[in-house]
Design a protein with these regions (language model features):
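Extracytoplasmic gate region of multi-pass secondary transporters
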Residues: 38-42, 223-290
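Interfacial helix-cap and linker-helix signal at transmembrane-aqueous boundaries
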Residues: 45-46, 77-78, 158-170, 256-257, ...
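Intracellular juxtamembrane helix-capping segments at the cytosolic ends
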Residues: 123-137, 145, 340-353
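Helix-loop-helix hairpin linking two adjacent transmembrane segments in secondary transporters
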Residues: 152-199
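C-terminal transmembrane helical hairpin of 12-TM major facilitator-type secondary transporters
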Residues: 271-282, 288-348
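A late C-terminal transmembrane helix in Major Facilitator Superfamily
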Residues: 352-387
Length: 423
């Protein structure tokens, strides 16, 4: 791989970086269903396998664990063997895991097919594509990673209703086979055009020295990155934001039920499903939006702005949570202040440690999402169980948001400036 700086767009068409972004978006959308429509399969799977819901939900936990805690290995494989091959393998595992899940007759087999195989496959695609986008877009890292990450959430918007309809008309097993083939084929086809830009590649007219966001003068290996205090501060900050967000994400339904707003009508729809739909939309839109903002005003300032927005939104939500219309609007605003972590943190990481090992380096940082998935839901449940109300949960979420915003404009900004000064 050459280290020469290339200052013109690479041809053929599929090596144009905007084509790469479109292909990444398609591949991301193809893997969103295993996570976001899992809840549609729990009822029929529970009836078929004769297991408890708690045992069945370990499938979902394994899916998330394999997506996040294995991300350094998944990202290393993408860096080592290239995105075309590995994204194809990831799509094959994701789609194949669904097809195999249609044949299982016990929960342990489901753990393997849906949890392990699907989880590892979707993890390869997610961290691999984020790592690829930060390399193709050194001048628009926030926007590019935001758009790619948004695809992961938006894909389920197009699949939820047809999958739900097919389960009701044809059964869950037939649905898993059909949609397993669909998502696998789409992902494999999109992967065929994916390529890594040459080391040192730059878009025409772009100069790192003139960029509005500070850039590393060289690329750091994963070993070097793990020895840097800046990485560990980013890891702690992302863990705190992932935890705070997932404390809310996992409990929107219980919030609505306890405060008796879930079935109240807002614009002719029940407040709970309307709030979930709006939240999914805002959770996707915030990723490219704040990514784009960070490309212009800087990463730390954007983090402080977005995290403060979630802090304020969660406090206002707590104050007016028993009002259905405000419940819908404010839950959407909370998600708008949270989802951008999936664009701001990878962009900041690559700015700081360079692009050559971008996928592998982000794989280590993405473990923070796994930390949040383990801590967020259980921590919220523990606080509610031991205090008898959701007050403590809202206070903890607001505190984590405010603390992370403060760290962004104080410790992170100062430490990154010293890091860049050392070269």
């Amino acid at each position: 791989m050459t280290s020469a700086v290339i200052t013109s767009e690479t041809k053929p068409w599929y090596l144009n970086r905007w084509s790469q972004l479109v292909l990444a978006l398609i591949a991301m959308m193809s893997i969103s269903s295993p996570q976001y429509v899992w809840t549609l399969f729990t009822g029929p799977l529970n009836a078929k396998l004769g297991t408890t819901l708690a045992e069945l939900q370990w499938t979902f936990s394994l899916l998330i664990i394999l997506q996040t805690w294995c991300s350094p290995l998944q990202a290393y494989l993408v860096d080592r063997f290239g995105p075309r091959l590995l994204i194809s393998i990831g799509a094959l595992m994701s789609g194949g895991g669904w097809v195999l899940s249609s044949y299982v007759d016990n929960v342990w087999a489901l753990y393997l097919t849906y949890g392990v195989i699907c989880g590892f496959g979707t993890g390869i695609i997610y961290v691999g594509l984020i790592g690829l986008m930060v390399r193709w877009f050194p001048d628009r890292r926030g926007l590019a990673t935001g758009l790619a990450a948004a695809g992961y959430g938006f894909g389920a918007i197009f699949t939820s209703f047809p999958i739900d309809s097919m389960i009701k008309s044809s059964g869950y097993a037939h649905t898993l086979v059909v949609w397993g083939f669909i998502q696998g084929i789409i992902g494999i086809l999109a992967a065929q055009g994916l390529r890594t830009p040459p080391d040192g590649w730059l878009p025409a007219g772009y100069s790192p020295a003139a960029a509005s966001t500070a850039q590393a003068k060289r690329s750091y290996t994963p070993r070097e990155m793990l020895q840097s205090p800046v990485f560990w501060l980013l890891f702690v900050m992302m863990s705190m934001m992932a935890t705070s967000g997932l404390m809310v994400v996992s409990n929107v339904g219980p919030f609505a039920n306890e405060y008796k707003v879930g079935q109240a009508l807002v614009l002719g729809m029940a407040a709970l499903p309307l709030s979930l739909t709006l939240s999914r939309l805002t959770n996707g839109l915030t990723r490219p939006f704040f990514g784009w903002v960070s490309d212009h005003i800087g990463r730390e300032a954007t983090m402080a702005l977005a995290f403060s927005l979630e802090c304020v939104a969660i406090l206002i939500l707590f104050a007016f949570i028993d009002r259905p219309a405000l419940f819908v609007v404010l839950t959407g605003l909370v998600f708008f202040g949270w989802g951008e972590i999936f664009s701001l943190f990878p962009a900041t990481l690559t700015d700081t440690f360079g692009s050559t090992y971008a996928a592998t380096n982000y794989g280590f940082l993405y473990i923070a999402q796994g930390v949040g998935s383990i801590l967020g839901g259980p921590a919220a449940a523990y606080l509610h169980q031991n205090t008898g109300s959701w007050t403590a949960v809202f206070i903890v979420v607001a505190f984590l948001d405010a603390l992370t915003a403060l760290l962004a404009i104080t410790a992170l900004r100062s430490m990154r400036q010293k890091h860049f000064a050392k070269g």
